[in-house]
Amino acid sequence: MPWFKNLIKISKTITNQSSSYKSITPLASPLLAQFLQFTKQYSTNDHVVGLEATKSDQKPRIVVLGSGWAGCRLMKDIDTNIYDVVCVSPRNHMVFTPLLASTCVGTLEFRSVAEPIGRIQPAVSTQPASYFFLANCNAIDFDNHMIQCQTVTEGVETLEPWKFNVSYDKLVIASGAHALTFGIKGVNEHATFLREVHHAQEIRRKLLLNLMLSDVPGVSEEEKRRLLHCVVVGGGPTGVEFSGELSDFILKDVHQRYAHVKDYIHVTLIEANEILSSFDDRLRVYATNQLTKSGVRLVRGLVQHVQPDKIILSDGTNVPYGLLVWSTGVGPSPFVNSLDIPKAKGRIGIDEWLRVPSVQDVYSIGDCSGFLESTGRQVLPALAQVAERQGKYLASLLNKVGKEGGGHANCAQNINLGDPFVYKHLGSMATIGRYKALVDLRESKEAKGVSLAGFTSFFVWRSAYLTRVVSWRNKIYVLINWLTTLVFGRDISRI
């Protein structure tokens, strides 16, 4: 984009010059002049470029931090006739996480589970005052309605990251959560998580590389067994689904295409307690039996230390591995921890209308937020359906506020917000491989409801997620991938 090139050029040339708003008004357009405002707050240099506060005759600006389920659903439903939208995120797409495990073994292509932000909300690509910024938010000045960001330039060796500020009328913090490591030494250095597309790409590369290397002359029997030992830590839905996909891949594809090493590859799933603890007891027993039949070894234990080639359990057992996937749940990110606002179990504290009550014009949704104790509500689980429904509700609320003239900063105090957010759990689903899945339609663990397992559940699982895929483009991608995998097998190319 031309304006972005101008931003890069200007940010480099003004470091040692005295600048003001007047010095940039002759540039490309009034809009560019608005964007290239110089502020001295937060900056380690003399100046920081950024978006200035909106004026009363302009549309109010909503700034969304994050591009996950919550933030993307909000951006999809927000009325861009009322608001300008600015999204700040280190990734330019939304990940359809329920199908991410399928991409690790070639059942689906990576593009099938990634939806570009510009397709979810076209305004950020087409409207003159709406933007997507590839950046991280480092700090928030709640008093002055401003965020400090730093660009993500990873992979561009010729460009150093720089800071910029964005003023907001309404701020929505939907920055998600980070994988929990429980402070275990070696996890971040040696394990692979499964939360992003690049995680799935890394898992696939490692898996296929280990398969090919183990087939090369000169590799000892012991080293073959280590290279082809896939260890999954965490018995939640993600860990179980990945184990199921991996066992399918081994039984159907490795046995055909890597016949020389098929007897060496195996999967171990390590969980401290019961797998799928939120599911019905009968479904857990069924999943345990099916995974065992598929060759997945279930181990109950606690990881104490992770080394480059093995993990050490709390009882002293050494478990060699060639691929280690870590899926033990999520917790607050360093960014959320850095915010000086009330928290709820480590998350950003919100009220019944998803507002951050300690500051003006700030909302929080998704995995990074939780109801304050004063609301009398429990902190909701970190689930996609929770985040998506919060995004839908908040978009409706902000559209209502904007229509009633409360879109600008500090203008919504006297507006009736209507009914508070209410969450009703629709159930849980998980695939366990071999065309079998679990469907638990209970509203809670203690409630009664329908529980299904087997091929029928697998059909329900696939149908449900196919309908939930964001765009028709990706729906078609997913359907075609499933059909080609069924007919021709999984893609085992290492690119």
Swiss-Prot record:
Localization of this protein: Mitochondrion inner membrane; Peroxisome
Sequence motif: Microbody targeting signal, positions: 486-495
InterPro entries: FAD/NAD-bd_sf, FAD/NAD-binding_dom, NDH-2, NDH2-like_C
Catalytic activity reported: a quinone + NADH + H(+) = a quinol + NAD(+); a ubiquinone + NADH + H(+) = a ubiquinol + NAD(+)
Cofactor(s) the record lists: FAD
Pfam family, one: NDH2_C
Binding site for FAD: 61-91
GO cellular component, one term: mitochondrial matrix
Enzyme class, UniProt record, top EC level: oxidoreductase
UniProt-annotated binding residues for NAD(+): 228-264
Gene Ontology terms, MF aspect: NADH:ubiquinone reductase (non-electrogenic) activity; NADPH dehydrogenase activity; oxidoreductase activity
Record membrane topology: Peripheral membrane protein
Transit peptide: 1-41
Cofactor-binding details, from the entry: Binds 1 FAD per subunit.
Highest taxon listed in the record's lineage: Eukaryota
Keyword entries, A-Z: FAD, Flavoprotein, Membrane, Mitochondrion, Mitochondrion inner membrane, NAD, NADP, Oxidoreductase, Peroxisome, Transit peptide
Enzyme Commission no: 1.6.5.9
Function: Alternative NADH-ubiquinone oxidoreductase which catalyzes the oxidation of mitochondrial NADH does not translocate protons across the inner mitochondrial membrane.
Record-stated family: Belongs to the NADH dehydrogenase family.
Name this protein carries in UniProt: Internal alternative NAD(P)H-ubiquinone oxidoreductase A1, mitochondrial
Naturally occurring in which organism (per UniProt): Solanum tuberosum
